Amino acid sequence: MLKRFSQQYEKLILKPVKVFPYEFFIVLLLLCIPVIYTSYDSCILRLKEGLNSVLLRHNNGQFIFDVALSYIVITCGYLLYRINKFGYFFIITAELLLSIIAIVELFLYDNFHMDINYNIFQFINETNDQESSEFISTYIFKFDNLKYPLILLICLWLQLKYRTFFRVIRNKYPKPLISSFIKKISSLVIVVYLTFCLLFAINCLSLFSSSWTRNITTVNTNYLRITRSLAFKIYNTLLQFHDTKNDINKCADSLLNIDAEIKGDTIDNIVIIIGESYNRHHGSLYGYNKNTNEFLSKIDNLFVFDNVISSINGTSKSFQNFLSTASVDSCSEWFDEPLFPAIFKTAGFNVVFNSNQFVQNKCDMWSPECGFFFHPRIKNRMFSYTNQSNYLYDGELIDNYKKICPEVEEKSPNLIIHHLLGQHVNPSCRFPSNQTFFTKEDYYDRVELSDDDKEYVACYDNATRYNDSIIAQIIDMYKMKDVVVIYFADHGDEANDFRIHKGRAGITEGANCLHCQLDIPFIIYLSDKFTTKHPIIVEKINKSIHRPFMTDDLPHLLFDIASIKTKWYKPKRSLINYAYNSKRRRIIKGNLHEGAVDYDKVCGNNILMTIGFR
C-alpha cells in the first residue's frame, strides 16, 4: 500500500516538476528576485541607520508561498500540456507576467519603498493624463531605472540557457538519479509547505478577514511575512476593492440622519484651502532658508501653527480622515460617521467644492481616491456646487472661480473648499515658467546633491512659492468680508531632504521620513471684519498655535468656529477649544505591512528637522 501511494505521489505530485524542471526554476527565481533584493537592501539600511529605524522584512514565509505558487503554475501548465500541448505557452506567458511583476516590485521598492498593493491601483485610478505623463517623466525615464527592463531580458536568456543546462544534466547523469533527487527535494518542499499552512491555519484563521485588514495594529508581526507573498497581495487587493464599495455605501448611509444647527453668532464665510504634497520644512514661515512664503509673510492677521501633521501620507486616506467626523484613534472607521461638509449643509451652509484635481466628470465614483464624494447618494448631501473642469495651473482654477464667485456664493453663510494641485507629483509642472525664482545655483551649499537633484529641489521650492502666491490671491478675494481662511496640505513630500529621494515612501523609516511626509503647514487667516465681530475666537486661535494637532480632527475645529451644534462635535478634539486634549496620541496607520506608528513617540518633542545630509 505504501509502495502504491509512493507511485501515485510521484505520478500526480512530482510529474509536473519532472516534465518542466527548468520552467519551475525560472518561475521560482522570478518570484524570489524581489524577496532577495528587498531583504538585502533592508539589512544594509538597518546597518546604516540603526536597528530601530527600519522595519526588517520577514521573507521566510513568503519564500514558502512563492515555492507553492511556482508549483501551481507548473502544474497548471502540465495539465494543459497533457490536454492539448498548450501548457508550454501557458508557462511562458506566466513567466512573462511574473517578469513584469518583478520589475514593478523592484521599481516601487527602489523609488517609494513600497510593495504592490491596493494603494497603487488607487493611485493609478486617480491619475489623469497630465499627471501620468509627469509621473513617467519624473520616475520612469531615469537612468537608474533602466536596470529594470534588463531583468526581463536576463530571465528570457535564462529560460533558453537552463533548457540547455538541464538537457546536459540529463545526458550526463542517470535518469533514476535525477528523478530521485527531484523527488526528494520536491517532497521536502511540499511537506514543509503543507506543515506551515496547517500551523498558519490553526493560529491565524481570522487573518484573511476584512476586519483583520483594517485592524492591522492587532496582528502579530510574526505573521506579517505572509502578506508579502504575491498570492496574498492579489487576494488583499481584491478584498480591499470589494471593501471599498461597501465602505462608500456605508458612508452614504451615515449621511441619511444628520442633526445639525447653528447656535449663536456664526460666520459669513469659512474658506478651506487644501494644498498638495507640501512639506512645511520648505516654508520660510517655518524657518526655511529660501523665501518660499514671500506673499503670505506680508499679510496681517495670519496665524501659523507649528505642530500640525497629516493623518497619513496619501491623498485618498487623508481626504477620508479629515472629511469624516470619526478620528483615526477612535473606535469608528471613517465611513461610520458623517462627513463634515454634509453636516454644514444640513445646518444651513452653502457648501462649495472647487478642485483642480478631483473633478466629477473625470473621476470614478467607486474610487476612494477621488470619486467617493461624487457618488449620487453622497454628492448632493455634501455640496451645493462643484466645478466641472481642472486646469494646468492653480492660478487658472482661481481665475475661473473669480468669474462665477458672486453667483456661487450668493447665499450665506458659505463654506468654500478650494483644493489645489500645489506641489503634486512633478513640481516642475506646478508653476508657470515666468514664476521661476530659484535655480540649482541657489543650492551651492547642498554639496551632497548632483545638479539634477538640486534642480528638483529648486523646482519644488518654486512650486511652493507659486502655491504661496495662490493662497495670497484667495485671501485677497475675501479680505473685505467676515471670513476665516484655513490652509493646510493633505500630506507632505520628500525633496532630497535627508536622502536622495523624491515623493513619498513608507512610514516606518525613522523620524526624518515622518517629518518630511507628514509635517504640513497649517495657517489661519482672519479678516479685519472677523476680528472685530468674533474677538473670543481670535483669542482662542492665538492661544493654540503651538498645540500638537492632526488633521483628522479638523471637523471639530470647524464646528467650533462656525458655532454648529451636532452630536458629532467633540470639544476635546477642537484645536481652539479650552477642553482640547493636547496629549492625544497621533497614530499614523500605514499599509498592511507597516502597521501603525506613534508619531510623537518616534519624533519626540522635536518639531523641526535639518534639511541636508553628508
Residue ranges and their predicted role:
Residues 14-26, 89, 160, 164-167, ...:
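Membrane-interface soluble catalytic domains
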Residues 199-447, 519, 551, 556-577:
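Active-site-proximal alpha/beta segments of enzymes that process anionic O-linked groups
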